[in-house]
Amino acid sequence: MSRIGKKPVQIPEKVEVSVKGDLISIKGPKGSLDRSLHPAVKLAIENGMVNVSVTDDQDRKTVALQGLFRSLVANMITGVSVGYEKKLLLNGIGYRAEVNGNTVVLNVGYSNPVNFELPKGISALVEKNTTLSLSGIDKEIVGETAARIRRIRPPEPYKGKGIMYSDERIIKKAGKAAAK
């Protein structure tokens, strides 16, 4: 049995969890999320807890699915109750970001500004022109959007210029040694 999968997930007060067939729906104050379940995974809702179990606990792949779906359900519950946020820093001379409706306009050293269309359910906020904050209820979409924006201009190892996560540390390389 999966150690993570065995732990039940606590359901907060303002969150509703329902299972219909192979679809789980979670509604909360921030919104609602749906996900289809694998045929080998079973969910049981008892006493304000969600228990994840599998049909065959001897097969390694289904045991791995138990831990996976337990984590996915926990992330969905956290998303609809609290939400997720990722911060990106723009480091470089003249690097800045601005939000126009559903588009983030990035000036990151290219000859033209880069227009990045935000996916549905993601909101962006710019603080001090160099900090971009992405928020939403789906952890996967927030993380994927942050990774796609970072990929536009990843930080380079010599000066650290580029787009980086707020908690990321760039290991800088030494430059060329001067000629003697």
Swiss-Prot record:
Pfam family, one: Ribosomal_L6
GO molecular function: rRNA binding; structural constituent of ribosome
InterPro entries, alphabetized: Ribosomal_uL6-like, Ribosomal_uL6-like_a/b-dom_sf, Ribosomal_uL6_a/b-dom, Ribosomal_uL6_bac-type, Ribosomal_uL6_CS
SUPFAM superfamilies, A to Z: Ribosomal protein L6 (SSF56053)
Gene3D superfamilies: Ribosomal protein L6, alpha-beta domain
Signal sequence bounds: none
Keyword flag Cell cycle: no
GO cellular component: cytosolic large ribosomal subunit
GO biological process: cytoplasmic translation
Keywords annotated in UniProt: Ribonucleoprotein, Ribosomal protein, RNA-binding, rRNA-binding
Protein role: This protein binds to the 23S rRNA, and is important in its secondary structure. It is located near the subunit interface in the base of the L7/L12 stalk, and near the tRNA binding site of the peptidyltransferase center.
Subunit structure as annotated in this protein's UniProt entry: Part of the 50S ribosomal subunit.
Family to which the UniProt record says this protein belongs: Belongs to the universal ribosomal protein uL6 family.
Protein's name in the database: Large ribosomal subunit protein uL6
Species in which this protein is naturally found: Desulforapulum autotrophicum (strain ATCC 43914 / DSM 3382 / VKM B-1955 / HRM2) (Desulfobacterium autotrophicum)
Lineage: Bacteria, Pseudomonadati, Thermodesulfobacteriota, Desulfobacteria, Desulfobacterales
